[in-house]
Regions:
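A late C-terminal transmembrane helix in Major Facilitator Superfamily
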Residues: 88-115
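Intracellular juxtamembrane helix-capping segments at the cytosolic ends
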Residues: 70-83
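Helix-to-loop junctions at the C-terminal end of transmembrane segments
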Residues: 16-30, 114
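A membrane-interface helix-boundary motif in multi-pass transporters
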Residues: 112-129
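Helix-loop junctions at membrane interfaces in 12-TM secondary transporters
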Residues: 49-61
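Multi-pass alpha-helical transporter architecture, strongest
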Residues: 125-144
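Structural signature of the two symmetry-related core transmembrane helices
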Residues: 32-47
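Loop-to-transmembrane helix entry
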Residues: 1-14
Length: 144
C-alpha cells in the first residue's frame, strides 16, 4: 500500500513538473504562481491528516505534488530574477546553502516532534509553509 502511494505521488510530481509547469510558467509570472502554490502546499501537507483510509490519500497527494511542483522552481526563478546579474551565481549558491541547512533540521527535531504526537510533523511543517506563504503575500515588494 505504501509503495503504491509513493508511486502515485511520483507520477503526480512527474506530471506537474513534466507537463504542467512549463506552459503555466510561460503564461503566469512567478509571484502569482507562488501566491497560490505555497498556500496549496501548506494546506495539502496538513490535509494528509484528514483521510481515515489510505485510499482517500489518493485525493490529497496530487495537491501536495502540485503545490511543491510549482513552488520550488518558481521560488528559484524569483530569487534569480531579483538578484543583480553580477551576483546571480553567488545568490543562488547562498540559496542552495540555506536550502541544504533547512533540510538538515527536520531529521534533527523530527523525533522530538513525533514523540509529542504522531500527527505533529505534518502540522508543524504545514504551519511553517503557511507562515512562509503569509510572509510572502504580506511583503510589499510582491504585491500587485
Amino acid at each position: 500500500d505504501i509503495g503504491a502511494l509513493f508511486g502515485y505521488l511520483g507520477l503526480w510530481i512527474a506530471l506537474t513538473q513534466g507537463l504542467l509547469l512549463r506552459p503555466v510558467s510561460a503564461r503566469i509570472p512567478p509571484v502569482p504562481i507562488l501566491r497560490v502554490s505555497l498556500l496549496l502546499m501548506g494546506l495539502a501537507v496538513m490535509g494528509i491528516l484528514l483521510p481515515d483510509r489510505s485510499v482517500l490519500l489518493y485525493a490529497v497527494l496530487p495537491l501536495v505534488s502540485l503545490g511543491q511542483g510549482f513552488s520550488s522552481p518558481n521560488l528559484l526563478s524569483l530569487i534569480s530574477n531579483k538578484a543583480d546579474s553580477s551576483m546571480q551565481g553567488e545568490i543562488l549558491g547562498i540559496n542552495q546553502s540555506v536550502n541544504s541547512f533547512a533540510q538538515l533540521l527536520p531529521p534533527l527535531i523530527g523525533g522530538f516532534i513525533v514523540a509529542m504526537d504522531i500527527r505533529a510533523p505534518l502540522l508543524v511543517s504545514g504551519s511553517f509553509i503557511l507562515l512562509a506563504w503569509l510572509t510572502f503575500v504580506s511583503n510589499r515588494s510582491y504585491r500587485s
